[in-house]
From Swiss-Prot:
Residues 1-44, 425-436, 599-608 have a biased composition (Polar residues). Residues 94-117 bind DNA. InterPro entries: Homeodomain-like_sf, Myb_dom, SANT/Myb. Residues 67-121 form the HTH myb-type domain. This is Transcriptional regulatory protein DOT6. Gene3D superfamilies: Homeodomain-like (1.10.10.60). Component of the RPD3C(L) complex composed of at least ASH1, CTI6, DEP1, DOT6, PHO23, RPD3, RXT2, RXT3, SAP30, SDS3, SIN3, TOD6; UME1 and UME6. The gene is DOT6.
Amino acid sequence: MSISTSLNSASIHLSSMDTHPQLHSLTRQPHSSSTAMSKNEAQESSPSLPASSSSSTSASASASSKNSSKNPSSWDPQDDLLLRHLKEVKKMGWKDISQYFPNRTPNACQFRWRRLKSGNLKSNKTALIDINTYTGPLKITHGDETANAQQKPSKKVEENVLTEDTAEFTTTSSIPIPSRKTSLPSFHASMSFSQSPSNVTPTTIVSNAASSMPFAPPTLPAALPHHPHQHLHHHPHHKTLKPRSNSHSFTNSLNQDPIVRSNDEEKYGFIPKVFVRSRRSSFAYPQQVAITTTPSSPNSSHVLLSSKSRRGSLANWSRRSSFNVSSNNTSRRSSMILAPNSVSNIFNVNNSGSNTASTSNTNSRRESVIKKEFQQRLNNLSNSGGPTSNNGPIFPNSYTFMDLPHSSSVSSSSTLHKSKRGSFSGHSMKSSCNPTNLWSKDEDALLMENKKRNLSVMELSILLPQRTEVEIQWRLNALSSDADMLSPTHSPQKTLSKKTCPRMFKSGSTTDDDKGSDKEDVMGDGSNDDDEDNVDPLHRAKQSSNKTVFSSSSSNISSKDVSPDPIFSPDPADDSSNTSDAGSRCTITSDTSSSAATMNRTPNSKNPQDIALLNNFRSEAITPRPKPSSTTTSITTETTNNMINHSSSTTTTTNNSPLPSINTIFKDML
């Protein structure tokens, strides 16, 4: 210790100058010659000097001279190790630590330590050492090793010596004997940290140079290049890391590869920045609004995800928001409209009911099936060129995207009815069935066909979600009361079923009767029962061929449907598809059977509760209309029920041969 303190005043002065860049810049030129001389002296004496006060003095002098020549902030790797040991292991105060570094002020020591911890000294491998796990006895010899390192002719020689010096380093004297040899026997004497501030002083010079070396444990400082300060000047890139980048984490051992260390330092170094970005991410969230405005934001979000976490979070927002935007802005209706392109394109013009399209979202699959059938039948109807009904949309308002203007042809309405028949989409009938809204002809046609489908009121309520079972029952009763006129005579213009049903093919007089019956049907009036009585049997016979066609199509549709969707054959007599579903369906004959009979289900009805409800409602709400045979409406509910049951049973039997069975049924009913 006394030896280290015996450094000449000039060397001390120079070392102190090193700590101050300005002073150093002022004094650097005058001392350059002296520093070179001191270096030469150190080199000359290095091979022969024993571990003695003279050797330590020369080493310290050379170190101090180097300090003067080097950046004032330069530290010897051994000084760095000692500094870290004193601060991190012994938890000493900066003022006490500065005593081990006579040329360093407490602030200089603190600044150096911060730079080491921050990873800003990327090239300095002492920063890579985990001082807590450092095995070599940290001794003030680090400064000595610095001198040795300074005397090393080249990095390569030093690197070769590093491993050898490691063991020696632990025992090296506090002030290394200036020698280029890798082994530093002189160091062994004072390897113990004498911890005199003077011992470390010379070491401060070599800190950066040591870092450039693959810094094996403490031995590396001894192996540092002869002119570490030159090395620093020639390798400015070693300080590419920004200060504070690694200040928070230094756990790597000194043995760790500097490259690996630098990578880790970079990772750690970015952590504070990442935190900064994360703090900004709070501002990034408001940006989601802008992102949501652009549906293409999901693409940008992918780009953002590749970047930092704040952008990733922002990208997540943009992704979700864009999805929400598409769903919110265009509304579910648009997506539903887009689903069946062909159908939606056909009905783009008909958006009057589009505001209610959301109701159709639930059954998109079924609707798609409906739309397929609907498209086919629409084409067929367009080819047939049936008369147009200004009142009925092809689809109820629930199929808003499918709705046609009221000016749409009856064929379109019948097509709607067919599409409805093809599936259990209660949405199609729902809007039209609202009691507040007059029953649409589509709904009436559906109910009329339900007579043949033998659908229960519950099933009808599913088909007509906007209508309650009571309403449907009432309407069925009304239609059944008017069925005589409605089923055969209901003009295609008035009802979709007319168009789809063979009834459409009836004579003009029959259609006239049907028109009147339509009006009366809505009113629940049965004044045209006689006309229907006249029409039904013949009309049934006429429709037999048509009904077979529709029944086959309807049966196909029913097979497609996930649930036993009621197949609404355009023909009132179309019972083929109804046969399979008759058990669960209310026997609804579009024929003269009263609405009560219509509400009545087949004896094998799967829903006895529905049957009871229908019977009660029928008995309470409406007197069943007489069949065409009876001009009076006084036919009892039981009679109509029996007739309907018979007709339904015959219908079931007639699924295979719908025409003769229907005719027979009507004859029986008449």
